[in-house]
Amino acid sequence: MSKSTKKHSAAMTKVDRSTVYPLKTAVEVVKDTAYAKFDETVDVAVKLGVDPRHADQMVRGAVVLPNGLGKNVRVLVFAKGEKEKEALDAGADYVGADDLVAKIQEGWFEFDTAIATPDMMGVVGKIGKLLGPRGLMPNPKVGTVTFEVGRAVKESKAGKVEFRVEKAGIVHAPIGKVSFDAEKLQGNLVALVEALVKAKPSAAKGTYIKKISLSSTMGPGINLDISDVTANI
């Protein structure tokens, strides 16, 4: 048995799969069961009572986590003129138009999020098939197609997380690193769940939040007490 397998097995013994943990305890267990040599990301999976095959039950949006993500987010902005300057002043890593489109067409993707002013979407549309599958296509629904590029850049840098329900009705999102203080991870998780509650489609019937689980990159999944999480909203 390899060292990594032994560590994973040891981590698994610390988690009772049949137990739903209070928020505070769940975060402590996630931190305790992380065993990788790198600073693992803490991820959340939320099972929603929706059927995303129906357009009126799609859940999509974004939230700025109060305690950030613990990583440097590389922001690219498609803009010209005054908006180009505004984006640069706000801290954007790359700003341009056709020049950036040409680089991306050549296979360059050294950025984590893309923002565009509405008047640039005709240009950005040329590379939609390249950006879309990578989750990088600017979209007005999550605030990445906007004339307020300065605010959008600052939000992305501060730890803005985009979410979208998958076919199985699950939303996956990062909420920080295992090195974060437990209180910061708790705050980020509550902020994410609150955003999901606000994004509830009117067509969704029955129980909306069915399950919440937490895990580190390499660690086991921990089931949370939903009522304890929502009580903090």
Swiss-Prot record:
GO terms for biological process: regulation of translation; translation. Keywords: Repressor, Ribonucleoprotein, Ribosomal protein, RNA-binding, rRNA-binding, Translation regulation, tRNA-binding. InterPro entries: Ribosom_uL1_bac-type, Ribosomal_uL1, Ribosomal_uL1-like, Ribosomal_uL1/biogenesis, Ribosomal_uL1_3-a/b-sand, Ribosomal_uL1_CS. HAMAP family: Ribosomal_uL1_B. Binds directly to 23S rRNA. The L1 stalk is quite mobile in the ribosome, and is involved in E site tRNA release. Protein L1 is also a translational repressor protein, it controls the translation of the L11 operon by binding to its mRNA. GO terms for cellular component: cytosolic large ribosomal subunit. The lineage of its organism: Bacteria, Pseudomonadati, Thermodesulfobacteriota, Desulfuromonadia, Geobacterales. The keyword DNA-binding does not apply. It holds the Pfam family Ribosomal_L1. This is Large ribosomal subunit protein uL1.
